[in-house]
From Swiss-Prot:
Effect noted on mutating residue 10 to E/S/A/G: Loss of catalytic activity
Family under the similarity heading: Belongs to the HAD-like hydrolase superfamily. S-2-haloalkanoic acid dehalogenase family.
Effect of residue 157 to C/S/H/W: Severe reduction in catalytic activity
Function: Catalyzes the hydrolytic dehalogenation of small (S)-2-haloalkanoic acids to yield the corresponding (R)-2-hydroxyalkanoic acids. Active with 2-halogenated carboxylic acids and converts only the S-isomer (or L-isomer) of 2-chloropropionic acid with inversion of configuration to produce R-lactate (or D-isomer).
Name under which the protein is recorded: (S)-2-haloacid dehalogenase
Effect on the protein of changing residue 177 to D/I: Loss of catalytic activity
The EC number(s) this enzyme carries: 3.8.1.2
Amino acid sequence: MDYIKGIAFDLYGTLFDVHSVVGRCDEAFPGRGREISALWRQKQLEYTWLRSLMNRYVNFQQATEDALRFTCRHLGLDLDARTRSTLCDAYLRLAPFSEVPDSLRELKRRGLKLAILSNGSPQSIDAVVSHAGLRDGFDHLLSVDPVQVYKPDNRVYELAEQALGLDRSAILFVSSNAWDATGARYFGFPTCWINRTGNVFEEMGQTPDWEVTSLRAVVELFETAAGKAEKG
């Protein structure tokens, strides 16, 4: 993997657990937290795809709020303004997966350029990584806002290529979202899919270059490659 000089990470679901909002959802609607979180995430993604197709962009914070409104209406829950604000705020304070902080530090020590490439707005990306104390670990926090379209549009992946100043073949794209990894693979990024939950990959004509179960396993890919290079 010595040809890899930079890594672009998806944020939501890859580095940070989107379902860490379950607790807040349970506080607002006891016993309904998991149900709310699952549908909220589903609709959030659907709204980004639909808005891209319709060329009707709103930023991710708005799409997230719209998805929450739908979720509560669908589940017959009364979402007042205060609860809506509290739950949307929870998306700015997501918890990183447990192995993420140490893994990012190890990748950084290897001299790799690190970027986040996210559907999130600049403010929401910064809020999430700063709340977790991880802001200094990244060279770039890249939002879709400049191109006003969501992943998996090629214009989004181009943002990472431009910001990192590397050819796409030298940028490893890491995502836990199979649809995102598929889009990145079609764009030309070497791609690593973090399959935390034992899912099957999308049937869309592409497969990831690597499939792992955690970010720590991404570090191990580089360690293994370095060990082989030393022996070779």
